[in-house]
Structures are given as structure tokens and as C-alpha cells.
From Swiss-Prot:
Superkingdom of source: Bacteria
Membrane topology of this protein: Multi-pass membrane protein
Keywords from the named record: Cell membrane, Glycosyltransferase, Membrane, Transferase, Transmembrane, Transmembrane helix
Native species: Aquifex aeolicus (strain VF5)
GO cellular component: a single term: plasma membrane
Record's protein name: Uncharacterized protein aq_1704
EC number from the UniProt entry: 2.-.-.-
Family label: Belongs to the glycosyltransferase 83 family.
Amino acid sequence: MKKDLFLISLVSFVFFIFGNWILSLTSLDEGRNFYATLHMLRTGDFIVPYYNCNYRFEKPPMLYWLGSLSFLIFGISEFSARLISGLSAFGTTLLIYFITLKHVSREKALLSALTFPLFIHTWIESRAYVPEFTLVFFSTLGVYLFSIDRFTLGWTALALAFLTKGPVGVILPIGIYLLWRRDLKFLNFKGVLLFILIGFSWYFLMIYKFGFNFFFKFFIFENIYRFTGTYQIHNMPIYFYPLVILVSSILFLPVFLKILKDFDKRLLPFAGWFLLVLVFYSLSKNKLHHYILFSYPALSVIIGFYLTKRYIKYAYIVGSFLLLILMFGVYIYEQKRFTPKAVDFLKNSEPQKLYFYKHENSAIVAYLYRCITKENKFKKGDYVITKKKYLRDFKNYKLLIEGLEFEGKEVLIKVE
């Protein structure tokens, strides 16, 4: 087992953590999360999240708390922020090993655990300062603990998942357990009580401080409205997630034929896990690619069951080559990015009047740790960050910085 765990640790470092510092912060989520974490550290207020001098009610605080701890240990940097996701991915890989070890076999446990880091999607999300992988870790931990009848600890894990992303961190793991075991033994009084005390602690404080405004914004708007489509910003077709999964698991496509041809009944609980997550998020009117991450642990077990040591060896050779190409591409892209160039310029010039126009770059807000408002009217001498396509709205200006970002070219101008 020691050799297995060493191999898993080594692979996880390479595929989840190494090189996470190459790319500077991205907008929108990373910048907002980084700012909120930095604000907590500088103000000592670890209850109320802020971004750009406004309350940030959209996300619970677990990522910010873990990020603050990482900042204190390793310093404030992209590496220490993204390390949270990398370690969460590593922890999830270990859980896949122990789940498979308990319910299948040791040989399949190693193959299943080694499958997970070869999902291309995980290479990206484990290097992003977002809460998704932390949610996957705590949710998977809850499922594992429930499956071995450690219900009190399982509820504690779900409380942490609830503090990471909200209701989804509880609903899906419980749904998976019910599909798996079809009993109510998990309704342990001590465990449920701990869940309420831990999981609801922050929510109670926020509701006490902000009342219905917070309750509506987080529970109604950010969860119910997004799921039902009352508020739509990421409207994708029903086949969106199957497509994401196929691309992510491209190294294992030949194995899918074996799975369909000779499915083993021992994998039914994992098939239920995978399908529940897939169907749940496919029914949501708002779809983002990282929502589907929680299906990957189950898919890893299913795929790993049919792998041979020879197959996984060659898969890692190809996967390592693909990762190297991806990281090299990211390095080249970083040299052309707008954000690092703009941040260097703005830190040196320190303009008093800096605004956004029809656009927002949260990474710049985070790096400068200053409030930048959106405006529509400007005066001579104002500095403005916007997309290049909006330059047509300005008559007289001086172009200071231009560069690439994921949403298109961005510019920094000075109004003349």
C-alpha cells in the first residue's frame, strides 16, 4: 500500500500542482476569490466576504478560509491560492483509492486512482483558485464515510461541503448514498446535529447580519434561480456535459466499449453516482463545465475496473506529453496576456482615477487591491480598462496597454 500511495502522491503533484504558478490570475472567478481572501487577511473579518469594496454573497467562505491559511504558510501568490484546488484534487484521488479498495479490490483501487489524474479537465480545475475541487473533495469524503458507516464523520464532511458551495454539497452525496444503500441509517442524530452546528454556522451569522437580503441572494437567486433558469447566464444544450466528459476522458475512449459490452454488477453503485450527477446538472438551466467534476470519481472507478497496467502505463506517457504541450502553450499565452502587463503599469503609475467600461477584469482588482468602478462617462486624464472592440466609443484617447484575455483583447487607455 505504501508504494501505491507514493505513486498516487507523485502523479498528483505532477498533474494537479506542478506549474500552477505559470498563469497569472484569471477573470472573473479567480480574481474575485483572490480579492475576497486577501480582504479577510488584511481586515481580520473572516465572516463577511468582499469583492471590489462590495459584499460578495455569491459563495460561502470555505475557499477563502483555506486560501487565507495557505497565504499565511506559503505567502500571497498564485501558487499558494491554487494549491487549495491541487491538494483537494490529490485528496480526491486518495479517496478514490480507498473507496475502490473497500468495495472492489486493491489492484483496481490503484488503477482507478491513477485514472482520475488523466482526465484532462482535472488538469485545468486543479490549477484554478475556485471552490469546485474543494467541493468535490468534501463531497467524495462524505460519500466514502457514509459507505463505511462512519455517519458522524460523514455529516461533518458534508457540513464542510455545505460551507464550500452550498446545498449542492449535501443533496448529491445523500442522493448517491440512497442509491447505493437504500436505507436511512445515515440519519444519525449526532451527525445531523454536528452538520447543523458546523454547516449552518456561517449562514446563521450572515442572515443575522444581513437578514433576507443575504438569504434571497444566496439561497434563492444563486441556487434556485440558477438551477430553474429564472436567472440564465450559462444556457447550454442538454448534451453539454456528455461532450465535456468525452473530451476530458479522451485517453480512455477505447475502454468505453469494454464497459458497455461487459458491465460488472459490482460497479452499479458507481454507475448510479455518475448518472445522478450527470442527470442533475444536465437538468439545470445554467451549465458550467466544472459542475460535472463530481462525476469523475465514480467514472474513475468504472474505467479503472477495466484497465490493465500496460494500458495505464501508455496512457500516462501520452498524458504527460499532452500536459507538457498544454503547459508550454499556457506559458506562451501568458506572455501575450493583458492582465500582467496592465498590473505592472498601474502599480508603477498609480493613477488616481481608474475605471472599467462595459467590462470587468477582477484579476486587476485583486492584484491592485483597490476598488475599480464601472462608468459610462469619462473626463480628460481618466484611465479606463475595457475591451478593444469598445474603443469605437471613445474619440480622444491614448492607448497604453493592449493584450489578450480569454474573453478577447483588452486595453488600458488614458482619456485625452
